[in-house]
A protein has these predicted regions:
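Tryptophan-centric aromatic hotspots in well-structured domains and transmembrane helices
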Residues: 38, 104-105, 122
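Short N-terminal micro-motifs specific to bacterial/archaeal maturation
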Residues: 34, 63, 95, 121, ...
Length: 155
C-alpha cells in the first residue's frame, strides 16, 4: 500500500468512526508514512484540475476571497519557490504571523511542501510574546505583513 493510500485509509477509518470515540480510539492504527508529504502527495494530487473552492474567506464588510484547489496549489507552489530562495529548508522552523487572509493559507501550504515546521502566531501577539516564541521555538524564518514587522525589532 502506498503512503497516500495508507493516509487515506487512516483518514477514512476516523471519518467512519467519528461518532464512536471508543472504537476509533481502540482500533485506530497510525499509518507508516516513511516518505509522505501531505501538501505534495495528497493536496496537490487532489487539486490538479480541481476548480472546486478550497478557500473562501468572507470579510466583516462582506468582501470575499475565493480560491479553487487548483489555484491554491499553484499559488502555494510560487510561495514555496520564493521561500526556498529565501533559504527555507526542510526542518526549518518558520513563524507565520498573518491574519485570516489568502497569504496565510498560501504560506502554510508552501511551508508544508518544503517540509518546514510551521509555528502559527496570531497577529495579536506583543513583541514580548514573540521574543518568547522565537527563542523557545528556535525560529529561523518569519513571515508577517508590513503592519507587524515592528513587533520583531527586539529580536
Amino acid at each position: 500500500m502506498s503512503a497516500v493510500q495508507e493516509f487515506l485509509a487512516a483518514r477514512d477509518f476516523l471519518l467512519q468512526h467519528r461518532s464512536n470515540h471508543a472504537t476509533a480510539y481502540k482500533e485506530f492504527r497510525w499509518p507508516r508514512l516513511e516518505h509522505f508529504n501531505w501538501a505534495l502527495d495528497h493536496f496537490d494530487a487532489m487539486a490538479q484540475g480541481n476548480e472546486n473552492p478550497a478557500l473562501w474567506i468572507v470579510e466583516e464588510d462582506g468582501r470575499e476571497s475565493k480560491l479553487s484547489f487548483a489555484e491554491l496549489s499553484a499559488r502555494s507552489n510560487r510561495v514555496a519557490n520564493w521561500l526556498r530562495q529565501q533559504g527555507v529548508r526542510r526542518g526549518d522552523r518558520i513563524l507565520i504571523m498573518l491574519g485570516n487572509e489568502v497569504p496565510l493559507w498560501e504560506t502554510m501550504l508552501a511551508a508544508f511542501k518544503l517540509g518546514a515546521v510551521v509555528i502559527p502566531a496570531t497577529t495579536l501577539l506583543t513583541p514580548d510574546d514573540l521574543v518568547d516564541r522565537v527563542e523557545r521555538g528556535e525560529v529561523r524564518h518569519v513571515v508577517t505583513s508590513a503592519a507587524h514587522t515592528g513587533k520583531f525589532d527586539q529580536l
